């Protein structure tokens, strides 16, 4: 599927920027250690691939999805092969004591990417998943930023959502709270964020769901739950 053709573009949106700064990017990545949290999701996998192909000094990927992590490794080995740096994956929850043990033994990292999130509005339909959403989107961000500061990371990056602008649901509100916390902490740590809209064909997206229905020869549905 040609996604560019589907959305009416001839070139990737940031293609020129990436190409123009390719030498600087390659130089920075080659001599740096990276930690990618939530690296087995759609955005996380894309970020991990971009870092890996520039041969980082170390690239460690954390995600709770063991299956997605295995597929990520298979995909990278099939397309990029092996680099000269260290590449490790860990099937861990970044809110766990096991993650803290990982940081204690594997840190420091120069760049920390926090791409983990509960991103669906439907996840706030019950109090249990809602509590998990707040834990992941807010408190795990606070925790991972604290660890990044303690290890002396050069930069901390976190993904947000367009729904954080004038939020009308708890998912957007949780990300807005996260943004406010990070903006306050940016006085003592270099931090950047990016608000993502709905990412076409990402896991759980509507377009991904359409492909699934086609593949399984199922009718389209409009669930009310």
Q: PLM features: what roles do these ranges have?
A:
Residues 1-34:
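Non-catalytic terminal and boundary segments that flank Rossmann-like NAD(P)-dependent oxidoreductase
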Residues 40:
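Conserved glycine-rich cofactor-binding loop
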Residues 34-37, 61:
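Hydrophobic Val/Ile/Leu positions in short beta-strands of Rossmann-like dinucleotide-binding domains
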Residues 43:
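Hydrophobic/small residue at the entry helix of a nucleotide-binding pocket
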Residues 46, 50-61, 77, 92-135, ...:
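NAD(P)H-binding glycine-rich loop region in Rossmannoid oxidoreductase-like domains
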Residues 170-225:
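NAD(P)-dependent short-chain dehydrogenase/reductase
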Residues 63-68:
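Helix N-cap at the beta1-alpha1 junction of Rossmann-like dinucleotide-binding domains, i.e.
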Residues 114, 118-179, 184, 192:
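Conserved Rossmann-fold NAD(P)-dependent oxidoreductase catalytic core, especially the SDR/UDP-sugar
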């Amino acid at each position: 599927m040609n996604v560019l053709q589907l959305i009416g573009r001839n070139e990737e949106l940031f293609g020129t920027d990436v190409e123009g700064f390719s030498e600087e990017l390659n130089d920075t990545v080659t001599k740096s250690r990276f930690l990618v949290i939530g690296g087995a999701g759609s955005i996380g996998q894309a970020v991990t691939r971009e870092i890996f192909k520039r041969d980082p000094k170390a690239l460690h990927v954390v995600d709770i999805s063991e299956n997605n992590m295995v597929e990520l490794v298979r995909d990278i080995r099939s397309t990029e092969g092996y680099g000269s740096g260290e590449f490790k994956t860990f099937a861990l929850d970044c809110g766990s004591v096991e993650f803290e043990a990982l940081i204690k033994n594997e840190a420091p990292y120069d760049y920390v990417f926090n791409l983990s999130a509960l991103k669906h509005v439907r996840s706030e339909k019950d109090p249990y998943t809602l509590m998990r959403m707040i834990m992941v989107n807010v408190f795990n961000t606070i925790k991972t930023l604290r660890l990044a500061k303690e290890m002396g990371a050069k930069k901390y990056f976190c993904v947000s959502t367009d729904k954080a602008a004038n939020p009308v649901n708890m998912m957007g509100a949780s990300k807005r709270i996260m943004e406010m916390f990070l903006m306050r902490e940016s006085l003592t740590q270099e931090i950047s964020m990016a608000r993502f809209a709905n990412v076409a064909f990402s896991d759980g997206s509507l377009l991904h769901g359409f492909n699934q229905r086609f593949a399984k020869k199922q009718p389209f549905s409009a669930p009310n739950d």
